[in-house]
C-alpha cells in the first residue's frame, strides 16, 4: 500500500462552488489533501508540507517525459500510448528543485543587492550605475575562494547559496 502522505495538496477555498468536489476527487485518487480557508497565514502554508533536504526546502519536479508523467497520460506525446506501464521508456526526469520562495521575497533580496551595489559604487541612480558599473569575470576557483572556509552552514540566508 502506498503512503498517501507522500504527496500533499493544500487547497485554499476562495468561495468556489467546486472546491469541495475538487478536494474529494483528489482524496479519491489516494493523495492526501486538506481544504483551508483563503485567509490562512503564509507561515501556516509553508509549514503544511515543507520538503526539506539538508535544511533546505524543495519543490517536486516532474518532466513531461518522465515515467511518472507518462503513466499519468503524457505517453502519447512520446508515441508510447500503446505501451504497457512497465514498458514505457522515459524521456524525462523526476526530482526536486530548490524552493526559492515567493516572487516578492526574491524581488526583496534583489532590491537589497541593488541598493548595496549602488552604495558600494557611489551611485545615486540606476542610470548612473549603468555608466559607472564595471563587470569583472571571476573564475570558478575565485568564487570558491571568496566563500568562508571550514564552516558548516546550518541555515542558508536567502541571498547566499554555497552550492
UniProtKB/Swiss-Prot annotation:
Pfam families: IMPDH. GO terms for molecular function: IMP dehydrogenase activity. It comes from the Bacteria. Gene3D superfamilies: Aldolase class I. One of its GO terms (biological process) is purine nucleotide biosynthetic process. InterPro entries: Aldolase_TIM, Class_I_gatase-like, IMP_DH, IMP_DH_GMPRt. Belongs to the IMPDH/GMPR family. PANTHER family: INOSINE-5'-MONOPHOSPHATE DEHYDROGENASE (PTHR11911:SF111), INOSINE-5-MONOPHOSPHATE DEHYDROGENASE RELATED (PTHR11911). This is Putative uncharacterized protein HI_0221.1. The lineage of its organism: Bacteria, Pseudomonadati, Pseudomonadota, Gammaproteobacteria, Pasteurellales.
